[in-house]
């Protein structure tokens, strides 16, 4: 299926690794032009070079910006090219006791995970509405509903982006602009890979044994009974970013194998 993404320019925050990087690859394979983002120039340059080697005939560039620093965000907004599709993927988290987590950790996670998408949407949505076409996607998490007790600040931010996404969708009524969110379940990102390796070494087990135990003991409702691949999440994001998804608006699409539970 041709997703009709040729000629579209996409900006993906937090896209030098993990789901963001996999999404960039999927979009480039469909002929879209992609602008990457990471916190440091070095990480952005490395990611851009990798994609240029894999997709020599496609357009890929990058802009470094730390979304916890408003000055860098303002500079990014000034240097962005015309964007047709915005994917708000950047996210940070810190794990710890609710009683010991300082206010600064709450503020930083909210600033990066929520306000990055708010500021970018405020800047880019008006033009999308004027031209009557655009896509905005917010990448949430199963933590928005599961809320692990050691990830309460992070979970709060991922619930917040669902509200922002749903509210912005209301502003697109009657247009060909859509705003949706994606809710990945446990995904085999670089961080998850490291978790499996560390746990396997600590418990003197194989990574497969650790993964199996995680889903039989922790994510018991998961129908997948495994971590999703970043490519699997990226394929869903790519479809929602395309013109083919024109009837999907204001939705929160789960890619979690029911790990977060619930009938819907």
Where are these regions (language model features)?
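Conserved glycine-rich cofactor-binding loop
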Residues: 9, 16-18
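Short, small/polar-rich loop/turn modules that mediate ligand/substrate recognition or access, typified
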Residues: 173, 178, 248-250
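Alpha-helical segment proximal to the catalytic Tyr-Lys
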Residues: 126, 170-171, 246
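Substrate-binding pocket helix/loop in short-chain dehydrogenase/reductase
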Residues: 73, 97-98, 105-110, 218
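Residue(s) in the substrate-gating loop at a strand-loop-helix junction
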Residues: 141
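Active-site helix of classical SDR
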Residues: 121, 157, 165
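Short C-terminal tail/terminal secondary-structure segment
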Residues: 146, 237-238, 245, 249-264
